[in-house]
Amino acid sequence: MRPLLKIAAIALLTLGIPLTATAQSTMLETFENTPETRWRFIADTVMGGLSRGQVSFLAEGSNAFARLTGTVSTANNGGFIQMRMDLPAPPPADATGLRLIVRGNDQRYFIHLRTAGTVLPWQYYQAGFDAPGEWTDIRLPFSAFKPSGRLLRNTPRTTGIKSVGIVAFGRDHQAQVDVREIGFY
């Protein structure tokens, strides 16, 4: 009887480890099942800018991903292209950051978080990341996100996060960034 209990205990521990790891992270998006209904493309043209681009949803083998491409132009007070998703629910209260799997054209890109407190269109919390040519796991703690202005809190309130945007921003350049997964940790 004791060997059977030992085997049962090992089985429970083995099963419990993945369950614990899963409970500590929340997957937000894997770009499967009609992601075009959840994501939208936005450019500085909404304010007179000249940037152009698009978001495409692609797959390589069994891996679905989104690709943000375009030309970012700072002419005419512009300077961004973005793919944005409104969250179906806020992140878990104990989440400490955002996780992405990305690749790109060796350029710097940004995540913009909007919260209940970002009322004006130009308000957001921003953190940057580099997108190398190979798929890379990026972790951005919420403490790394900086407000776009003085009227916002210093860091976003986790339970108030309403949307996530992947953004090519702030300088003239050709953008291409692929995103395979987004989640909270």
Where are the predicted features?
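Bacterial N-terminal signal peptides that target proteins for export
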Residues: M1-A9
